[in-house]
């Protein structure tokens, strides 16, 4: 049991990170409708809140967080990422959030140090 707890303390736990990202999105965007003039502010708030909460976990990681907000207008979006890392310690998580007027896609990467 101690081995599991020790690895849990230094592991990238996707559910934990996903919840942090969702809370940051809800806090920054909440029930707002898409407004082009606010997108820069919203994306900045989402990534900064996410990074702040991730660092508060006190885990030995360097974090990378990206955020894309796009208006719902029928346009498509295709993205991809690739990482060369140690899959036993490093990890990533992508959260797609939406409301009636926009999509918000956040990716968080944790690199063990």
From Swiss-Prot:
Lineage: Eukaryota, Metazoa, Chordata, Craniata, Vertebrata
Entry-linked InterPro entries: Tctex-1-like (IPR005334), Tctex-1-like_sf (IPR038586)
Modified residues (N-acetylmethionine): 1
UniProt main location, coarse: Golgi
Keyword flag Lipid biosynthesis: no
Name of the protein: Dynein light chain Tctex-type 1
Cytoplasm among keywords: yes
Subcellular location: Golgi apparatus; Cytoplasm; Cytoplasm, Cytoskeleton, Spindle
Region described as Interaction with GNB1: spans on this chain: 41-113
């Amino acid at each position: 049991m101690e081995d599991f707890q020790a690895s849990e303390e230094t592991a990238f736990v996707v559910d934990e990170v996903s919840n942090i990202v969702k809370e940051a999105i809800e806090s920054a965007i909440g029930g707002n409708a898409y407004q082009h003039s606010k997108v820069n502010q919203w994306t900045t708030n989402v990534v900064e809140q996410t990074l702040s909460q991730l660092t508060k976990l006190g885990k030995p990681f360097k974090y990378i967080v990206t955020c894309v907000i796009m208006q719902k207008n029928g346009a498509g979006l295709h993205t991809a990422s690739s990482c060369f890392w140690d899959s036993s310690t490093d990890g990533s998580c992508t959260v797609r959030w939406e409301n009636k007027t926009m999509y918000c896609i956040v990716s968080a990467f944790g690199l063990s140090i």
